[in-house]
């Protein structure tokens, strides 16, 4: 996920957005107030000393959302704004690392001091699944994530594609639960 604005806005990063928003109304478009990227956006604003004048959930947040003026800043995926990437400002990346395709765009964590939580997907099995089945699923999943198609998708879309085994994933769930609690505390 990224935070983006029209190319003609006077802010190019979160510090500039914060400065601008202290004296001007800025509307945030997002996919829902309860999802992690939106919470990160609100927490960053709070840490940087401003509030969005208004915010609204949308079914779609793409180039048209910015060009139509429906929102001043949108919280969306890089893939949805890819067609107009050269015409907009990507203010920040919401995630652990900078996006390879946008190496000069700092993460929200770097810019606002909020934690670096990000959305991720995983492979889950029903409790009681035999170990040999879990091992086979893990073998296939790892091969797919490290394969050429997945790596090409990462380069094309900016999505982070990687493999974590069951132990690392379990640890990540615990760590991300703590990060989410930290975000919720900031937003209280």
Feature map (PLM): residue ranges:
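Short, well-ordered secondary-structure micro-motifs
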Residues: 40-41, 102-106, 165
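Hinge/capping helix and adjacent helix->loop/strand transition within the periplasmic-binding protein
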Residues: 1-61, 108, 118-153
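Short beta-strand and adjacent tight-turn residues that come in two discontinuous sequence segments
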Residues: 31, 57, 75-76, 93, ...
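C-terminal lobe and pocket-closing loops
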Residues: 79-145, 175-178
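Short helices/loops that flank or line small-molecule/ion binding pockets
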Residues: 19-22, 42-47, 60-74, 79-86, ...
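Short, Asp-centered acidic motifs that coordinate Mg2+ and/or phosphate
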Residues: 2, 72-73, 90
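An extracytoplasmic/periplasmic, membrane-proximal ligand-sensing/linker region
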Residues: 47, 132-188
């Amino acid at each position: 996920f990224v935070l983006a604005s029209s190319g003609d806005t006077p802010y190019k990063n979160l510090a500039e957005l914060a400065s601008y928003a202290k004296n001007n109304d800025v509307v945030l478009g997002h996919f829902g107030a309860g999802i992690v990227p939106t919470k990160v956006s609100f927490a960053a604003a709070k840490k940087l000393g401003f509030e969005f004048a208004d915010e609204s959930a949308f079914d779609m947040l793409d180039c048209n959302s910015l060009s139509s003026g429906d929102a001043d800043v949108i919280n969306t995926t890089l893939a949805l704004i890819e067609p107009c990437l050269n015409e907009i400002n990507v203010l920040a990346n919401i995630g652990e690392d900078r996006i390879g395709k946008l190496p000069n765009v700092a993460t929200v964590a770097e810019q606002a001091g909020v934690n670096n939580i990000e959305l991720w997907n995983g492979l889950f099995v029903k409790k009681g699944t035999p170990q040999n089945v879990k091992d086979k699923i893990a073998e296939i999943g790892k091969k797919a994530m490290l394969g050429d198609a997945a790596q090409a998708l990462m380069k094309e879309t900016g999505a982070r594609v990687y493999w974590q085994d069951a132990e690392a994933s379990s640890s990540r769930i615990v760590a991300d639960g703590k990060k989410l609690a930290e975000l919720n505390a900031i937003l209280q």
